Amino acid sequence: MVLQNESDKDINLGHRCYMEKTNKTALLLINTGSPDAATVEAVRRYLAEFLGDRRIVELPRWKWWPILHGIILRTRPKKSAERYKSVWTDEGAPLIVHTKRTASALEAELGIPVYWSMRYGSPSTASVLDAMRADGIDRVLVMPMFAQYASQTTAACLDGISEYQLSHVDVPAVRTIHDYHDDPAYIDALATHVRAYWDKHGAPVSMGGRLVMSFHGIPKASSDRGDVYEAQCRRTAELLAQRLGLERDQWCLCFQSRFGRDEWLRPYTVDSVRELGAAGVTRVDVVCPGFAADCLETIEEINDELRREYLSAFRGGGQSEFHYIDALNESPEAVKAYATIVRREAAGWL
């Protein structure tokens, strides 16, 4: 009989734990998030978390906290809740619905587990990482659902991963997808998606119209400090225009969803579309290449509010048309593109 001392037992236990590693790989999709419900209280909770992130509002806390808690969270939730109600579906918030469907389609395409989380709201990244650990996942490829990198989006999502790693002892191996703004698979998906819409509704350029590529804006100060977002948006727009065979005067790039009083990236989408209407451009098609899934900012802000702005500003003769081309969502072309990117980024794991 061979006796083992305590150190031998510890070594064997450690060896056994190591051998039990499954090398099981999974994909984690992360998007910004939505309130849990289109109610004032749910929106207030969501805005408190979202606007409380230093990535989103970079003001010193002593200056921002009184504004956020003393003014914004008292006045904005009611109006925002009404806006969310206008886009809410039987399944919930559009962003959540489309992200969930995209994850399911990718899981079928890739043959690996695909999880999804939200940086703000539910399901939180921490809760999903807990579920992944419980499922035996020990290698995670993180894909923030933003083709163009920005501190306020991609980096904020990756902060959620870092926070989890800091608070846990045993964490999975992690790889992250930084951006895919000029990836041929992504550009092909966008072009296929736009052409499919034009096959059904005609192309604006055949009517003397314009394709407007609207990206979410960020503060100009962020870009001035070196954020690559603006340059990546412009590159995406140029590549998409080339793939669609558009001349430079047949499309334009602009930025939407400005928040607060600071200057954001220009030109602003609402100004650009008003100018097109005032100039008598009879058809305007808007596509939002930076939005992986339709949400409040595309459905309500673009398809509803921006439509009204264009029609109100239109000064030409005859009929005017405004078309919103929906986000990639869970379309076959989107799933194919994401799968191509994931297989490359997960090389050696899959």
Identify what each model region corresponds to.
Residues 18-350:
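Active-site-proximal alpha-helix that buttresses catalytic centers in soluble enzyme cores
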Residues 8-12:
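Intrinsic-disorder-associated, low-complexity terminal segments enriched in Asp/Asn/His/Tyr and depleted
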Residues 1-2, 19:
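Accessible peptide chain termini
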